[in-house]
Amino acid sequence: MSQSRHRAAAPPMEREDSGTFSLGKMITAKPGKTPIQVLHEYGMKTKNIPVYECERSDVQIHVPTFTFRVTVGDITCTGEGTSKKLAKHRAAEAAINILKANASICFAVPDPLMPDPSKQPKNQLNPIGSLQELAIHHGWRLPEYTLSQEGGPAHKREYTTICRLESFMETGKGASKKQAKRNAAEKFLAKFSNISPENHISLTNMVGHSLGCTWHSLRNSPGEKINLLKRSLLSIPNTDYIQLLSEIAKEQGFNITYLDIEELSANGQYQCLAELSTSPITVCHGSGISCSSAQSDAAHNALQYLKIIAERK
């Protein structure tokens, strides 16, 4: 959708005498030019450089809407689109149509955010950027991507990436790290797009209150398990550190994810990462002679870290 208004009567813009130019001929001679490029060239020749201003930026969960205003001399037009680029294109197109005084001149400007899935190549979309814009708009923390697994033969590698956004998590797989990351972001966008508009507020509230365990809440918690941790030496033989960490997580309201690392350490031991969904997120490394012992070591290190944080004043 585009709108236009005149500040004053537009002067004739299409003169064929020597020393001047024809806007129509400019468009015909350079069919590959976008409306923005054509309008800019016109502005250069007439010494009326187009000026663009963003009037509205409404980023919704389903479809964002942008409105841009362009001023060329005495003419002002606006254009709307689901991206800033598209809105500017439509504003420039509207201005060109007025300058030509011929509404039949129309540039084909595809809407990049409303594609036909059967015809739109995936590489033209940017789910990672869209998810980041969504998070910024709602005041959420930015999405975090973690490469959790890499496998398969050299000629057919497969990567697995975990994407976390507040308390939500999605997993993406692909033949490259970038593709796995994109797939994870796409899953998030698909999840949010299935939420009806009336539930947007409740979703925002749910995410906004999903910060879980913060350092402040940990230090001031009256919980039995966390206070027991403060008094523990964490050096008693045969202690089940994984179970102890699980009990504290349940009490304090955070989740634990163990990520086994395929590569052995420099001294030939198994490796593991324990990720705690605290705020900020905590990641602790562990190693051992087996996967289970590496997980136990990671849990032990996580407990030591939580103990240090909880004891701080």
Swiss-Prot record:
Q: For this protein, what is any one GO molecular function term?
A: double-stranded RNA binding
Which residue ranges are recorded for the region named Disordered? 1-21
Residue ranges constituting the DRBM domain according to the UniProt record: 34-101, 126-194, 240-308
Task: Please give the residue ranges the record annotates as the region Sufficient for self-association and interaction with TARBP2.
Answer: 1-103, 102-195, 195-313
Q: Is Coiled coil given among the entry's keywords?
A: no
Q: Does the keyword Phosphoprotein apply?
A: yes
The residues forming the signal peptide are none
What does its PTM field state? Phosphorylated at Ser-246 in unstressed cells and at Ser-287 in stressed cells. Phosphorylation at Ser-246 appears to be a prerequisite for subsequent phosphorylation at Ser-287. Phosphorylation at Ser-246 and Ser-287 are necessary for activation of EIF2AK2/PKR under conditions of stress.
- A cellular component term (GO) from this record? RISC complex
- Residues found modified as Phosphoserine: S18, S167, S246, S287
Please name the InterPro entries in this protein's record. dsRBD_dom, PRKRA_DSRM_1, PRKRA_DSRM_2, PRKRA_DSRM_3, RLC_Component
User: Which Pfam family, an example, fits this chain?
Assistant: dsrm
* Keywords carried by this UniProt record: Cytoplasm, Phosphoprotein, Repeat, RNA-binding, RNA-mediated gene silencing
Tell me where on the tree of life, at the top rank, the source sits.
Eukaryota
Biological role stated in the UniProt entry: Activates EIF2AK2/PKR in the absence of double-stranded RNA (dsRNA), leading to phosphorylation of EIF2S1/EFI2-alpha and inhibition of translation and induction of apoptosis. Required for siRNA production by DICER1 and for subsequent siRNA-mediated post-transcriptional gene silencing. Does not seem to be required for processing of pre-miRNA to miRNA by DICER1. Promotes UBC9-p53/TP53 association and sumoylation and phosphorylation of p53/TP53 at 'Lys-386' at 'Ser-392' respectively and enhances its activity in a EIF2AK2/PKR-dependent manner.
Comment, domains:
Self-association may occur via interactions between DRBM domains as follows: DRBM 1/DRBM 1, DRBM 1/DRBM 2, DRBM 2/DRBM 2 or DRBM 3/DRBM3.
Q: Which family is it part of?
A: Belongs to the PRKRA family.
* PANTHER family xrefs: INTERFERON-INDUCIBLE DOUBLE-STRANDED RNA-DEPENDENT PROTEIN KINASE ACTIVATOR A, LOQUACIOUS, ISOFORM B
Q: How does it assemble?
A: Homodimer. Interacts with EIF2AK2/PKR through its DRBM domains. Interacts with DICER1, AGO2 and TARBP2. Also able to interact with dsRNA. Interacts with UBC9. Forms a complex with UBC9 and p53/TP53. Interacts with DUS2L (via DRBM domain).
Please report the name of this protein according to its UniProt entry: Interferon-inducible double-stranded RNA-dependent protein kinase activator A
